[in-house]
Regions:
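Catalytic alpha/beta core domains of metabolic enzymes, predominantly
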Residues: 1-27, 76-223
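A mid-to-C-terminal "edge-of-domain" accessory segment
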Residues: 1-66
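Flexible, charged surface loops at secondary-structure boundaries
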Residues: 30-32, 63-65, 83-88, 233-234
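C-terminal accessory/binding modules appended to enzymatic or scaffolding proteins
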Residues: 32-34, 44, 48-51, 200-243
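Active-site mouth loops of central-metabolism enzymes
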Residues: 34-47, 69-75, 126-138
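Short, glycine/charged-enriched secondary-structure capping and boundary segments
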Residues: 53, 109, 137, 236-237
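Active-site regions of enzymes building and remodeling cell-envelope glycoconjugates
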Residues: 54, 59, 66-78, 237
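Conserved beta-strand positions in the central sheet of alpha/beta enzyme cores
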Residues: 71, 157-158, 240
């Protein structure tokens, strides 16, 4: 069968970032081991263009319409073969309007297409036309893009489920932060507390956040006991363990 004849470009059972080639688009490098970039449609870029210099860490980086992205149906073997025959890497994505779940569609794209082609992830293949509730946009975007990034798939992301330009950019960057792909603010890890916790974990965590929130890129763990705490904070830069 096909699965026996084709080796996927990623290992679905362990994390390793897909080994795509590096492209430079609008002055930003993406692909390979480069930073995962944030895309935005031209219309939304125009809406925030007057305040980009004041947007801090939530700036849009690349305009989708100017990126040269090639969008295909990953089930279309003719389109897949065309991409695999190209000698130069191209930015690729899944076409809008397909009757596929986002995660399945991008996993199939990564499976079928040569890994040299960087992938632009989307939170939805059916962008809403009217106003949307923020939570209705947040949850699918976090699930779809976050899952794929944790698979090692994706060199850039595009969030369109949230219509507000500034809010959609914040959502995109927060997904990258939560998945460990870009750290632009202090990252905190705290245990849920249990019977071994002998202090108010919630209020202590808030005090620590208030004192350290300016430490961009630092990961701080707050643990409730000395039993599991040291192990759970192994990936942190600094840790606080209560008695």
């Amino acid at each position: 069968g096909k699965a026996e004849d084709f080796t996927p470009s990623y290992d679905p059972f362990s994390y390793e970032r897909r080994r795509s080639s590096v492209l430079t688009i609008m002055g930003h490098e993406l692909g390979g081991d480069k930073t995962v970039r944030v895309f935005t449609p031209q219309e939304r870029w125009n809406a925030v263009a007057h305040k980009i210099s004041a947007m801090g860490d939530f700036k849009p980086e690349i305009i989708t319409e100017k990126s040269g992205v090639i969008e295909i149906d990953p089930r279309d073997q003719a389109a897949v073969s065309h991409l695999n025959d190209l000698t130069e890497p191209q930015l690729i994505s899944v076409a809008d309007g397909l009757d596929l779940e986002v995660i399945h569609a991008f996993r199939q794209l990564a499976f079928e297409v040569d890994p040299r082609h960087p992938i632009l992830l989307k939170d939805t293949l059916h962008p809403p036309q009217g106003d949307t509730d923020f939570l209705e946009a947040l949850l699918p975007a976090a699930r779809n893009i976050g899952s794929l990034l944790c698979d090692g798939i994706g060199d850039a992301i595009l969030v369109r489920g949230e219509n507000a330009p500034g809010q959609s950019l914040r959502l995109a960057y927060n997904i990258l932060q939560a998945s460990g792909n870009r750290i632009f603010k202090t990252d905190y890890v705290a245990c849920p507390s249990c019977g071994r916790t002998l202090f108010n974990l919630q209020s202590t965590t808030q005090k620590i956040r208030a004192a350290t929130g300016h430490l961009k890129g630092v990961r701080i763990a707050v643990m409730g006991c000395i039993v599991n705490g040291p192990g759970e904070m192994a990936d942190a830069d600094f840790g606080y363990v209560g008695g």
